[in-house]
Amino acid sequence: ELLKVEILERHCNYNLKNLKRIVKKLHNLGVVIAIDDFGTGESSLGMLNEIPVDEIKLDRQFIKIHNDSIQDQNVRSLEKIPESVLGLAKRLGKKTLCEGAETQEQVDFLKTVACDTVQGFYFSKPLEEEKFLELL
């Protein structure tokens, strides 16, 4: 579990048979497999049964809904997408990570829908190695 390989969702349909073979080999080596940008590609939900992934990384577009330009009624309606996807991932036994959190409101929302891990500029922008080491 020291190494994680991320597969972009849009690449899952190119050669499914080959991808399944590679993922199986990586799993046998103890590599964690994640699907990145989940929900932005053209693959079906059935793909989650086809490819044995450990983690689903929900694309940031699904949490961008929390901003001042969207009316409250629309926010409540749009919240159902990440809530449903994260719930499905949990029921399938997958870990979840949501990308792109920039505000406290977004982080709070992701806590309420039980997202395992949250990443984004709210916590830190990309850092040079020296600055990163200072944080440790």
Spans of model-derived segments:
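EAL-family c-di-GMP phosphodiesterase catalytic domain
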Residues: 2-16, 29-136
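Catalytic-core regions built around general acid/base machinery
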Residues: 21-29
